[in-house]
């Protein structure tokens, strides 16, 4: 995440401007709170309960991947996958890659696009997330 001269994230309309190319654009906490009409404590609760994905860079700056939101609210399908993966022990950046990056397994689509294509695809991705968690836990 980039910094302005005053060491604050570079923002425009609630977006952190230099979000990585790997997980897409990010919202600031302020933007998410405004969009969801919740307090910062409410947002913290959503993060702690694995309902919203928050990423933190090496400088301690936080961002919320835009891909988990749809029409000014949390995308429930994406939220379900995020909750499964975070709850199963995956770190937030791995979850972001899992959800956002296109895969040949999904005909070159990312998880969000693939789940939106059909109920069968959504069911498949939820089952795959659960299987990945089971595999992770079996190996630790």
Enumerate the language-model features and the residues they cover.
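Non-transmembrane "mature" sequence context
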Residues: 1-140
């Amino acid at each position: 995440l980039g910094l302005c001269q005053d060491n604050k994230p570079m923002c425009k309309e609630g977006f952190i401007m230099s979000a990585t190319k790997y997980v897409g654009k990010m919202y600031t906490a302020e933007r998410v709170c405004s969009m969801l009409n919740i307090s910062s404590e409410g947002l913290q609760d959503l993060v702690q309960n694995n309902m919203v994905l928050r990423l933190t860079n090496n400088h301690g700056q936080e961002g919320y991947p835009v891909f988990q939101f749809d029409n000014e609210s949390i995308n429930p399908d994406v939220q379900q996958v995020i909750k499964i993966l975070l709850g199963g022990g995956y770190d937030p950046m791995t979850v972001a890659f899992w959800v956002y990056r296109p895969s040949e397994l999904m005909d070159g689509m990312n998880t969000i696009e693939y789940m939106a294509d059909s109920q069968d695809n959504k069911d498949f991705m939820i089952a795959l997330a659960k299987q990945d968690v089971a595999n992770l836990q079996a190996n630790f």
